[in-house]
Amino acid sequence: MNDKQNMTNDFIKIVKDVEKDFPELDIKMKVHKEKITFLNSPLELYHKSISVILNLLNQIQTSLSLFPDSPIVEQMEHNNLKLKKALIMLILSRKDMFSKAE
C-alpha cells in the first residue's frame, strides 16, 4: 500500500513539475485517494504537448545559431533536426487524426 502511495505521489509531483514548466498545457487533474484522473481530453493534451515540444526545438535551433560553427554545434543542430523529424513521425503515427471516423 505504501509503495502505491509513493508511486502516486511521485506521479503527482512529476505532473505538477510539468504544469509549472509548461503552463500553456493547462493540465487539469483530480486526485481522489490513490486515483488520478486527467480532466483534459487526451487529444487536447497530445496537441498541446506537441506544440510545446516544437517550440522548445525551435528555441534550441535559435540558440544554436548564436554559436560559431564547430563540429559539436553542427552535431547538436543535426540531432535537433532529427528530433523534429521523430516528432513529425509521432504526429503521423496518430492515424486517427488523419482518417475519417467510421
Curated annotation (Swiss-Prot):
Superkingdom per UniProt: Bacteria
Keywords: Plasmid
Record's protein name: Virulence plasmid protein pGP4-D
